[in-house]
């Protein structure tokens, strides 16, 4: 359900999205596509995939903008879209960084000891 023309989010620098459901479906699908390239046993994939699938199901099930905002609990849908864009960028970086692989070298023995 598109917002009425001329309505504002009330947040500086955050424009109204006229098709928030479509935009969120696209973003969540892209996130899931990137996650499929990460090993299934990686913690990041496991938990991000679960959360993203839950959010995608909410977007598909709830056509009302206000009700969806309440269900997602992330503010206005434009804010949720921004969060999803950030998550997509992070997923791509996690894939690039390959954090699931073992360390190249062992960390120093007292690396986390404080005070030194």
Swiss-Prot record:
Gene Ontology cellular-component terms listed: mitochondrial inner membrane; respiratory chain complex I
Keyword Acetylation part of the UniProt annotation: yes
Alphabetical list of InterPro entries matching this protein: NDUFA5
Subcellular location: Mitochondrion inner membrane
Residue numbers bearing the N6-acetyllysine modification: 30, 46, 60, 98
Domain of life per record: Eukaryota
Membrane topology (UniProt): Peripheral membrane protein
Modified residues (N6-succinyllysine): 98
Gene Ontology terms: biological process: respiratory electron transport chain
Family matches, as Pfam families: ETC_C1_NDUFA5
Keyword Mitochondrion: yes
Alphabetically ordered keywords of this record: Acetylation, Electron transport, Membrane, Mitochondrion, Mitochondrion inner membrane, Respiratory chain, Transport
Assembly and interaction partners: Complex I is composed of 45 different subunits.
UniProt function note: Accessory subunit of the mitochondrial membrane respiratory chain NADH dehydrogenase (Complex I), that is believed not to be involved in catalysis. Complex I functions in the transfer of electrons from NADH to the respiratory chain. The immediate electron acceptor for the enzyme is believed to be ubiquinone.
Family, similarity comment: Belongs to the complex I NDUFA5 subunit family.
Name of protein: NADH dehydrogenase [ubiquinone] 1 alpha subcomplex subunit 5
